[in-house]
Design a protein with these regions (language model features):
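Acidic/His metal-coordination segments adjacent to aromatic residues that form catalytic metal sites
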Residues: 2-7, 72-92
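DHp/HisKA dimerization-phosphoacceptor four-helix bundle of two-component histidine kinases
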Residues: 12-15, 19, 45-52, 89-96, ...
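Conserved small/polar residues in nucleotide/adenosyl-binding loops
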Residues: 133-135
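Hydrophobic packing residues in well-ordered alpha-helices of helical domains and bundles
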Residues: 10, 43, 87-90, 101, ...
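A structural feature that tracks compact, well-ordered secondary-structure segments
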Residues: 9-13, 18-25, 98-105
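Acidic interhelical loop/turn segments
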Residues: 32, 36, 72-79, 99-126
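Conserved alpha-helical segments that form or flank metal/cofactor-binding pockets of metalloenzymes
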Residues: 31-72
């Protein structure tokens, strides 16, 4: 059984992942409009990955006997500047997401939930692997 504190923290991450998905999709639309179809395609792929993360987190909560929920997802911007500015925003956003995931691992550790720590470490590893791949 997952603790309420950890369940709430993961539910917040689900909402954050959905916001990230919407952000990358909006960036994709913007880049396509500007004529950068390759960048648009890559950003759309990132959007789908963030959506998949949200679903994976929700499934995990449910498997642990908890209640997954999606809170209101804030509106994302629709104008992003130059292609360089777009990718600077992507980088800054991914740094914030990495910190959020690290904080989730810390909550799982504080709750002495080793199964959740193991599950969440998969997201930590993915962030590191993606960083190394894109360098």
């Amino acid at each position: 059984m997952i603790t309420e504190k950890l369940q709430n923290a993961i539910n917040e991450q689900i909402t954050a992942e959905m916001w990230s998905s919407n952000l990358y999709l909006a960036m994709s639309f913007y880049m396509e409009k500007e004529g950068y179809c390759g960048m648009a395609s890559w950003l759309k792929k990132q959007s789908f990955e963030e959506h998949a993360h949200a679903c994976e987190l929700a499934s995990y909560i449910i498997k642990r006997g908890g209640k997954a929920k999606l809170d209101k997802v804030d509106v994302v911007p629709n104008d992003f500047g130059t292609p360089l500015e777009v990718f600077e925003q992507v980088y800054e956003h991914e740094c914030r997401v990495s910190k959020m995931i690290d904080a989730l691992v810390d909550v799982a550790a504080a709750e002495k939930d080793k199964a959740s720590q193991d599950f969440l470490w998969g997201f930590v590893r993915e962030q590191v692997e993606l960083s190394l791949i894109h360098i």
